[in-house]
Amino acid sequence: MHYDVVIIGAGMSGLAAGIRLAYYNKRVCIVEKHYRVGGLNSFYSLGKHRFDVGLHAMTNYVPKGVKSAPLPKLLRQLKLTVDDFALCPQRMSVIKFPDKALRFNNGFDFFVQEIADNFPRQADNFQKLLRTISEYDELNLYTKPISARQVVSSIISDPLLVDMIFCPLMFYGNAQEGDMEFGQFVIMFKSIFKEGLARPEAGVRHILDVLVKKYKSCGGELKVRCAVTGLKCTNGRVVSISLENGETLTADRILSSAGYVETMKLLANHDSSKLNYQAGQLSFVEFILILNKEPAEMGYNTAITFYNNSDRFDYRKPDKLVDVSSGVICCPNNFQFENPLPEGIIRITNMANFDFWNKLS
């Protein structure tokens, strides 16, 4: 079977790419090895409970009617509206360290005041950081990468405040140990602090349902339980993919959202010794707790807590199975839903060592 475009992986990026291509009359096929779409952001059922995995909340939330922010722009590209995702904003989140706590909601002025109240000597420096962020072109792909730690620490002189600012940005949008590229820092700072967090009442499955429905309505084809076993190259470009069921698909263009390392391993003439790549070092483990009452009834009203219990925030691969000294605690119940969720849920995410987990019998 021949297509204009074949996309490997039905995660959010694969589905979004498929929508764009199919909308403009390309014959598109997305192949997904699992029986559910979503990739790292998916869902499953166990007993009578429904669980989301991956996505805690959507960043870049802005009130309806704002048109110039990234999320409305993205939705327009996908021919969707804000109402399609049925997003409900957070109530309040917090960055909690041993000696300080900084609250934030979807009103940026509130966060600015929290900085001034908790770090009065850094108030002017924080304003300087805001000017630096607003003047930086984070979308310029030709900008030379620079250390975000270096830039921020040259402006904010209190290491504690530096760590507290970095904590949520790293957990929600950084694949680099210890530091992050300043352009990525700017993107995450704007998306979490200047814009905000929200989620649909039905969780990630609602977002995925919307994307799949839109993709199919544009004429896109979706094959699930359809693992790719190999990529065939001719004259330096991939021309076809082999599927686990024995089928071969050809296409003018083949896109992969499976990850660089995973994609390279699919090449028919793959030789890892000749390919210069490094697998990511960061992994996470999640604990999901089901409660018999609303968390607010127990005095817990926070949507998301980004915490660190150590003297310094050390964002890196731990030397043990799980590092519980820092992490993210998400309570889906504490978003501004019209109706209460069926049950209380607490999701705890911590950094983990994949190598140690992979060796467990």
Locations of regions flagged by a protein language model:
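N-terminal glycine-rich phosphate/pyrophosphate-binding loop and immediately adjacent elements
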Residues: 1-121
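FAD-binding beta-loop-beta segment adjacent to the flavin cofactor pocket
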Residues: 43, 177-180, 336-343
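FAD-dependent oxidoreductase catalytic-site/capping-region signature
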Residues: 328-329, 333-361
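Active-site-adjacent "gating/activation" loops or surface patches in catalytic cores
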Residues: 171-198
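Rossmann-like flavin
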Residues: 96-181
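Mid-domain catalytic core of redox enzymes
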Residues: 229-340
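Helical element adjacent to the flavin cofactor pocket in flavoenzyme catalytic cores
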Residues: 188-238
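Glycine-rich phosphate/pyrophosphate-binding beta-alpha loops
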Residues: 55-61, 169-174, 284-286
